[in-house]
Amino acid sequence: MLIYSENQRRLAKIIAEDATRSNWTDWKWHVRNSIKSIEGVERLLGIEFTEKERQALRNTTEKFPMAITPYYLSLIDPGDYRNDPVFMQAFPSTDELRIENHDMSDPLHEDEDSPVPGLTHRYPDRVLLHVSNTCAMYCRHCTRKRKVGDRDSIPSRDDLRQGIEYIRNTPQVRDVLLSGGDPFLLSDEMLDWLLTE
């Protein structure tokens, strides 16, 4: 696949008229220009939902936010988008709001294995430290979708210090997995602080 195909160039120009190939290859440009609205997807893919569909999809994104990077959007086939696997992974579905008897808000039981907020300690020698709740793209199948994108639960340094102290005081822990969201969306300074602590 080309690094900057004709379709990608076209999308980049719709997003930002002055977009260049160097923008397209810059991950920060993609994060800044993530598509977060139903109307944005319609405009960029040249598709159209009915007003009823649009409203139902908005109801879904109110509970589970949407973010699709321009790159992922460029992989979607607008001619057959409803059957496109990338579209289904990235685009909200009204089925996400349907709760079945067997559905759980915490399917991995991370909260049960959480001795302090933001840390999961399920196995004796390793912990999972939740350092971010943001991703470049919000996958619709995410097992943490109840937290991802929630601006009210972005971990602060004080929140993270509780987890760090727990790790320091638990000598059997030898592996610490940084998780989220995507930890690599944190600033270099924040990652440096986490790894130093």
Named regions from a protein language model:
Residues 134-138:
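Short pre-active-site segment immediately N-terminal to redox-active cysteine/selenocysteine motifs
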Residues 91, 104-130, 140-197:
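Conserved Radical SAM active-site core
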